[in-house]
Amino acid sequence: MLRRKARRLIACLVMVVPWLIWLSAAAPAQTLERIAATKTIRIGYVPDQAPFAMPGPDGKPTGYAIDLCSQVVARIGQTVPGLSTDYTQLKLADAFASLAAGQVDLLCSALTITLKRREIVDFSQPIFVTGASALLRSDSPQDLRELFLGEHKISPPRSPSLHPFAVSRVGVRKGSSTEAALSKAIDAGKYSAVIVPYGTHAEGLAALEDRDIDAYFADRALLIGLLERFPDSSNLILGTRLLTRESYGIALRRGDSDLRLLVDRTLSAFYATAGFGALLRKYFGPEAGQLEQQIVAQSAIE
């Protein structure tokens, strides 16, 4: 009796499991079909990532990554008349899970492409090239100032040149790729530095001003944007040396190859226009020329 039940259970699993696998693989491919049927594309963004994604004066999101995603929306709109955009604010800690669960179709913010993140989502070709650096006070420990403001090259993690990490409290955005890189560097060197995670960049900058930490780490492009919007940044100095080198991308659901191809084609076409240089100048000023060369050099071709 038990054997017959076991055989029936196995037979059911043999029939059901392949169907479930097909269903999970087929679901992402239906994103463009759903967009066409509902005439709505759902874009998620992290609101405190100026100048990549931030609330505008009218409450609607704006920023470099948002504008690039608008190019994608316009491309889809060529075949879907009356297409509307539904924006959703997300916390960085929840953003990738929300995308994987199908709550949004695209993530448009300052999103570093990492292998760990690619376990649950896919990314477009790079939309930006940057790296993590430090924001310091004018009276931050001298060793930290020499390391990130000096002329010498940053040494490998185990080098004595990273000794200042051993006596410092350093802040970082919780859940960011910079947090992972900073933790790895400190662990590799067996330093006793304290990493203090913050929920938002604004909290981290406030802690730096209040001397709760000696330095705040984030992608350099984000730090530039934060300095421009911080009420009193005269006492803060942006590091010129990079701890990491990273690329940003637009995030999509894993396996959503049709939408990813459309996004990549849209980006490559836009990179070849004068409008791309104008967009970079709008958000990054004099650094636009160098940024354009770096991004275009990594772009996909037809």
What are these model-predicted stretches?
Residues 36, 153-186, 234-236, 267-302:
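Ligand-binding clefts/hinges and TM-proximal coupling segments of bilobed small-molecule sensing domains
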Residues 29-115, 119, 155, 197:
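Extracytoplasmic small-molecule ligand-binding "clamshell" domains
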Residues 47-48, 128-143, 220-221, 227-267, ...:
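Periplasmic-binding protein-like
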Residues 94, 108-120, 181-188, 202, ...:
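A ligand-binding cleft/hinge motif common to bilobed small-molecule-binding domains
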Residues 11-22:
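Bacterial N-terminal signal peptides
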Residues 23-29:
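Sec/Tat signal peptide C-region and signal peptidase I cleavage site
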Residues 72, 99-100, 208-209, 250, ...:
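Hydrophobic residues within well-ordered alpha-helices
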Residues 30-32, 78, 82-87, 112, ...:
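A conserved helix-loop-strand patch within extracytoplasmic ligand-binding domains
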